[in-house]
Amino acid sequence: MTDKLIIFDTTLRDGEQSPGASMTKEEKIRIAKHLERMKVDVIEAGFAASSNGDFDAIHTIAGLVKDSTICSLARANDKDIQRAADALKPANSARIHTFIATSPLHMEKKLRMTPDQVFEQARLAVRFARKFTDNVEFSPEDGSRSDLDFLCRVLEAVIAEGATTINIADTVGYGVPELYGNLVKTLRERIPNSDKAIFSVHCHNDLGMAVANSLAGVKIGGARQVECTINGLGERAGNTSLEEIVMAVKTRKDYFGLDVGLDTTQIVPTSKLVSQITGFVVQPNKAVVGANAFAHASGIHQDGVLKARDTYEIMRAEDVGWTANKIVLGKLSGRNAFKQRLQELGVSLDSETELNAAFMRFKDLADRKSDIFDEDIIAIVSEESAFAQEQEHYKFVSLSQRSETGEQPQAKVVLALDGKEVTGEARGNGPVDATFNAIEGEVGSGSELLLYSVNAITTGTQAQGEVTVRLSKSGRIVNGVGTDPDIVAASAKAYIAALNKLHSKDDKLNPQRS
């Protein structure tokens, strides 16, 4: 049995299924590049059959990412598998991940298939996938609620057909650690050809036990792959958190006895990128990547850490990518210094045009804000990269406001609609409401505001505000993110970013889930 734990990241597929976390192709590419830099073993880049947009994203990522295996999800049918294979053609290393539900509830109520029909479809799906690659993963959806004898029968058959990874899906987060770990162990013991495949765990966090269940699957069950997402992103209560799995196994190597090949210094930068793109703010007390993960407020704890860090710290903050909040650049800094700092942060822009545009935004910010931090630079580049790579139907031009005591604030917003400037004016219950009303008066999107949140990128009164806006229309939910030292301007940018995503025609199907 290998002593390495394979990390399978599904942020771009299962993570994206979280309401409001839908990503553009360009955003997926940026995250995929960060995952490759982190040395993630397998990147599930999407579900090729779900939409042309997802197919295109997988195909592009497969051509750009060379050091990680690129995977596409596919239902257990020839059409889905063919689509996945086509999307993965440019990949140096490709994997097809096919699945079908095996629990009595899912077979009867959702699939309306008999166990024998499911058995045959699973077997034939793996056989067909093997025509395109020798790296095939099979997942029994809702595996943790499946009949054990039937599950053994299905898994033995798909391994015989050539499945090289068997992924035990706790699709609804029903498992508890001891039972789930023993399920994986029992499957490996009872299936005669289990030694021909690597067993994997895929857990959801509905009862708050996704990480615990995954670790039990590894320690008790002998699984050697964990499927997880950055920040635990995922539908409902989320998925197994990559950062927690990786650091648990590394920190407690004495217990797990496994190696993880990731560059853990990339964890926090990647966490921040995913949070910025999706608009899902990381809770301050989140393990490993939360702002308070390495903070000590108790006087006793502070005294201990000052004397010896290991009194209260079991990990080093710098080992997961936390850096001191240092002032790095100012208004006198030149283009070369800006470019060098981007390289030090591991940030790349695709063209000189993007670099020049980002530098101009940096100079504009430096004129308004005396101290520029790494977080400011990352926010600038993230927003500029999104502007450069996405087609903007709506573009923010300018904003002015007027507010007098006892009267509703008034906002005047200038927008460019496909290059033509229009001006909207409106009042509202506060400056942000007035601004949104002014935008809607010109755009008329008919969308519903589901979420409005503000986060300070750095500390101090000069800090940039990062605003997340979540809009819903006709069943589609999108996030928009905007940054600016002026919170109302940041709000306008975020609202417009969300409108641009709504305007996109790349609607997705609602796939079966594992």
UniProtKB/Swiss-Prot annotation:
Name of this protein: 2-isopropylmalate synthase
Region (Regulatory domain): 395-514
Listed EC numbers: 2.3.3.13
Cofactors required: Mn(2+)
Main location, first listed in the record: cytoplasm
Keywords: Amino-acid biosynthesis, Branched-chain amino acid biosynthesis, Cytoplasm, Leucine biosynthesis, Manganese, Metal-binding, Transferase
Pathway: Amino-acid biosynthesis; L-leucine biosynthesis; L-leucine from 3-methyl-2-oxobutanoate: step 1/4
Domain Pyruvate carboxyltransferase: 5-268
Role summary: Catalyzes the condensation of the acetyl group of acetyl-CoA with 3-methyl-2-oxobutanoate (2-ketoisovalerate) to form 3-carboxy-3-hydroxy-4-methylpentanoate (2-isopropylmalate).
Domain of life (superkingdom): Bacteria
Swiss-Prot/TrEMBL catalytic activity: 3-methyl-2-oxobutanoate + acetyl-CoA + H2O = (2S)-2-isopropylmalate + CoA + H(+)
Leading EC class: transferase
Species of origin: Burkholderia ambifaria (strain ATCC BAA-244 / DSM 16087 / CCUG 44356 / LMG 19182 / AMMD)
